[in-house]
Amino acid sequence: MKKINKENFKKTLSTFTTGITVVATNNNSILYGKTINSFSSLSLSPPLVLFSLDKKSSKLKIFKESKAVSINILSYKQQIISNNFAKKNPNWKEINYDVLNNGNPIIKNCISNLDCK
């Protein structure tokens, strides 16, 4: 089997159209968010979703230790938000959001939002 070129593989996979979400949480009164496209429904009964983070992600430990997260399903008009949370240190000051009772941020004007445990 041929060795796969990482850049060609990435370019090929980028042609697959998928939804974009921002997964967010609150850890010790600090808000964290990450752009995620590896989001999927897992089950309707019980209602379960899943998302994946790279093992090398600086936010992996934070999300693993979180008891709850918000999942914000972005529209095609929210590329600026997607790009913001794709950065290592996103700027929450640029984002229009509310805070849920559990402390997690929920981004306003998304297609949909989920509050997940």
Residue ranges and their predicted role:
Residues 1-117:
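Active-site-proximal mixed secondary-structure blocks
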